[in-house]
């Protein structure tokens, strides 16, 4: 299924990093904080001065957006204004 965000919104896929304690214990999903890194999967109508595009990795406000499932994968539809930074590698 293809989802195209409307307005100044993005469809992002959270980047889940496996969390371990200092002792090497892997934490279950319920004990982890919500991720704040994601990859942009689809873009809506972005402002002209916006420097984001599909494939960019970003840091976003962890309590923003609407979580959705597409083909058993987790995604978030988020406003462009809730993107805090672009990760440049």
From Swiss-Prot:
Pfam families: Cpn10
Membrane-spanning ranges: none
InterPro entries: Chaperonin_GroES (IPR020818), Chaperonin_GroES_sf (IPR037124), Chaprnonin_Cpn10_CS (IPR018369), GroES-like_sf (IPR011032)
Annotated S-S bridges: none
SUPFAM superfamilies to which the protein is assigned, alphabetical: GroES-like (SSF50129)
HAMAP family reported in the protein's UniProt record: CH10 (MF_00580)
Subunit structure comment from the entry: Heptamer of 7 subunits arranged in a ring. Interacts with the chaperonin GroEL.
Family: Belongs to the GroES chaperonin family.
Name used for this protein in its record: Co-chaperonin GroES
Lineage: Bacteria, Thermotogati, Thermotogota, Thermotogae, Thermotogales
Gene: groES
């Amino acid at each position: 299924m293809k989802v195209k965000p409307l307005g100044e919104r993005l469809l992002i896929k959270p980047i889940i990093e496996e969390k371990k304690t200092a002792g090497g214990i892997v934490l279950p999903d319920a004990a982890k904080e919500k991720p704040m890194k994601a990859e942009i999967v689809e873009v809506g109508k972005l402002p002209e001065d916006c420097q984001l595009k599909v494939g960019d990795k970003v840091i976003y406000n962890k309590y923003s957006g609407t979580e959705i499932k597409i083909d058993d994968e987790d995604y978030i539809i988020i406003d462009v204004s809730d993107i805090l930074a672009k990760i440049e590698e």
